[in-house]
Amino acid sequence: QAELGYEDALLDQAEPFSQWVIGDSTLAEKLPLNSSKFHVEFTDHIQAFKEQKVRILNGAHTSMVLGAYLSGLDYVGQCMEDPIIRKSLDQTVFGEIVPTVDLPEEKAVAFAQAVYERFENPFVKHALLAISLNSISKWRARVLPTFKDSLAATGKLPKLLTYSLAALLAFYRSSEAGDQCLIGTRTGNTYEIH
């Protein structure tokens, strides 16, 4: 309010992150957006950027949240502060996911570092149970392609992505059926499985 000089009832807090990728490199001269304060990239290979987002941002979430939740954590920020979960995430993202992204390694690493900044944002309380919704289809879309590419490249199962599959199975092990969902148990407390 002090900065604007008036009260904006619709003003909301947002993450300080932006990435614009435009899928036509010939537009770079016509749209001088690189001179703006926002990061804008023009490319003829838009699919690689979509894959980077799905594999690194969404894949990191999907591969981390179920094991972290079952270990007693509730929010992404807690995961980033927990030394064991953080080390596991580092090894997953930089050791198993980034090598499968079809972009120069420095671009994928920079994107992953920006994702980490978002995960560490103390103003965003991103609940692990919210991220867990529809985890089977999310794992299939966000993690399985990386899993397969890693296996094809190395001839070995990617250890931490394999662990994320085991966590998925453990999370979906229900103790009872609810009205519209299954009910799981974590350290004596129940949670809804959607």
Which sequence ranges carry the predicted segments?
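Substrate/ligand-engaging "lid" and interaction regions
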Residues: Q1-H194
